[in-house]
Amino acid sequence: MKKLHFGVLISMMIVSCGDFVSNDTDGISDTVYVPLQGLDQVAIVDVDSGEVDTINIDYSQGSNTPHFIVIDEINRYWFVTTISSGYVGCYNLDTDELIDTVLVGDSPALMALNESSAKLYVSRMMPMGGMMTGAVSTIINEIDYSNPVDMFSSNEFEVSSPAPHGLAINQEGSEIYVISNTADWLYKIIIPENEETEQIVGVVMDVNSPNIEFSNIEVDRLKPIQCVSVNNSLLVVTCSAGITYDLYSGNDTIPGHIQLWDTVTMTLLDTVQFNWKSKPWHIINSPVNEEAFVALSGDNLYPRSAGVACLTYASDTLAINWETYSEDFEALHGIDVSADGKNLFVSGRGDGNLHIFHADSGEKIKSISLGHNPSAAGISTVYK
């Protein structure tokens, strides 16, 4: 495995609604793992020093396109999906050495893991947002990594909608949640014990959708991207929406949505809307407060449409706590939060930076360059 290392100059840029950058740049001891789709690499960023190591992702000839990373801090592994070559790779968290890969095919996208059972769940998607080309799928893979040198696909769950992308697991590890990027349907999969058959419950995410009774029909309206389980009965979902096409009226615009769902009854509790240019993308739950943080991808034709937002979900009600926008942000993609809940890390797929923010206010601390046209995607952070 080839490992590259280079120093990065930290740029202090003017940002946000108040055009203010915090001068608090020291003492952040987190390491952020960033898949660089455009370079077939994973960047390992020391946030405090601004130094970046890179690992080449070369599981197959041609493009691999590393897309999303999750970290198992208990068993000390990290995993990456490659949407072009169809692999999931497992690495040692302490040495960053490759341990094993498993071929799942059909454009593996997002992941959720159960650290206690050493099971990894992987969504397999179809092309979306012009980011890649690949196969249509309706499959969620379960990967057993209890023996990490010999990972294997231990189960498959099939939903009735195409392009499953967003994926989350509840705190008990008993249920996984899946959203279709093209059909606007949400699924709850009750994970089977032993040889039992899984139970799958599906609901449409928009009661006005033309496919309310036909989950296999693609409507491309809400275009949900990611979901996060914030407790054992609540799920927060991002819907990128934006420009959509209607057979009768032609092009239309739909505001970006954040939805709050009750996963026991599978009912929609509340919705917050942004403007149609916002494109809510990845989302992460605060480890200390009843808050979720959202990367707003934005529209490249509209400066200051990309940003970051904090939403509260107390009393089963969504409310925007703060929003931060800047012309320096382009196509924000991945987002994660430090274990103490104090700092946010956001990747810019378009601007090529890792942005660091104060989680309580949205003030930007600094930005770290990830190279030339890296197309940074779904990130994960760990305290080392």
What do these predicted ranges mean?
Residues 1-2, 155:
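Accessible peptide chain termini
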Residues 2-9:
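Sec-dependent signal peptide recognition
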Residues 13-16:
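C-terminal motif of bacterial Sec signal peptides marking the signal peptidase cleavage site
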Residues 18-384:
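Predominantly soluble domains enriched in secretory-pathway, periplasmic, or organellar proteins
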